[in-house]
Amino acid sequence: MASIAILGGGAWGTALAASLTVNGHTVMLWARRRQTCDAINARNENVQYLPGITLPAALCASPDMAYVCAGADLIVLAVPSCYLAEVAALMNTTPRFQRLRTAAVGQEYPLIGILTKGFIPDQEGMPHLITDALGALLPSGAHGQLVYISGPSHAQEVAQGKVTGLIAASQNPMAAIRVRELLRSKRVQVYSSLDVVGVQVCAAVKNVIAIAFGLLDAMAEHSEAFGDNTESMLLAAGLNEIQTIGKQLGSTHPETFTSLAGIGDLDVTCRSAYGRNRRFGRDIVHKGILDSFSGIQDLVSRLPEVGYLAEGVVACMHVQRLAERDRLKVPICAGLYAILNREKGADTFMQEILGW
């Protein structure tokens, strides 16, 4: 059994921490809010993000990152992309990482798992993959220990012990295999991959497609023109756009897009009632949620006002930058960008991408 640190007290981080604790690992969860830690330790519940789900009594939480990371064999970053740089900076200030900065590249570095989805922009606003951005933030000795974890895995179901499949992707095959074995259990199947680029692109862009799915879902309630066939059209077209972006950014394995990381994660994100991005698409139609914003830049800067985190909004802005730079044909992503930027309505969007 291993010692594992989960950095992030949201739903997904808490769910994975619970699963790993049930597996017999010693797990420490870091959360910024002391109230979250106190509730987990005293009541075995993450009241804010996983209400009603009883967590293992052996799972401990702390707001002290140095304490949580001190002896971990695996450190998992489970924070939204907008907080990744800040959390990585905090991790760098811990005594353990301060010591490791002076050490040679080797086995002293813990494995570093990454659950964060999306892209990280540079100072010019050009987006980069999570592992590339994180590699620039962490000591060079940690680069070979980075493992990206993704797949169709709603936090609520993982916390409830429902059977789930994940992909552990890394440029270092041994690191991917080690994380695979740590995460694997009777209820969680994990497969290793070397296509760390493709897996990350799938994880980021599927949230954009899910917003479009929410639009379609809401519009279907008032139109006889849309049905299951239409959803399959959108799903297939969305997967094609994900593959287009993945190939451009350097994906090495075409099968990634038909794996758990690709079609698997896309399907559950688009169809499940748990999905915040699908919910956002529905809210565009039913609640006019975009009416309070002047465009996508305004929306991104005030996204917390929505009341829940729809990561596909920010991802859509980044995909547009990539598409413009590399002249990529991604009509769903481009059309959705136009909607979020208040340039186009949902009806026009559906007519253009579905020929309706």
UniProtKB/Swiss-Prot annotation:
Assigned EC number: 1.1.1.94
Sequence positions that bind sn-glycerol 3-phosphate: K117, G151, S153, K206, D265, R276, N277
Protein's GO biological process: carbohydrate metabolic process; glycerol-3-phosphate biosynthetic process; glycerol-3-phosphate catabolic process; glycerophospholipid metabolic process; phospholipid biosynthetic process
PROSITE patterns for the chain: NAD_G3PDH
Pathway(s) it belongs to: Membrane lipid metabolism; glycerophospholipid metabolism
Record's subcellular location: Cytoplasm
Pfam families in UniProt: NAD_Gly3P_dh_C (PF07479), NAD_Gly3P_dh_N (PF01210)
Described function: Catalyzes the reduction of the glycolytic intermediate dihydroxyacetone phosphate (DHAP) to sn-glycerol 3-phosphate (G3P), the key precursor for phospholipid synthesis.
Record-given protein name: Glycerol-3-phosphate dehydrogenase [NAD(P)+]
Species, as recorded: Treponema pallidum (strain Nichols)
Lineage: Bacteria, Pseudomonadati, Spirochaetota, Spirochaetia, Spirochaetales
Gene name in the database record: gpsA
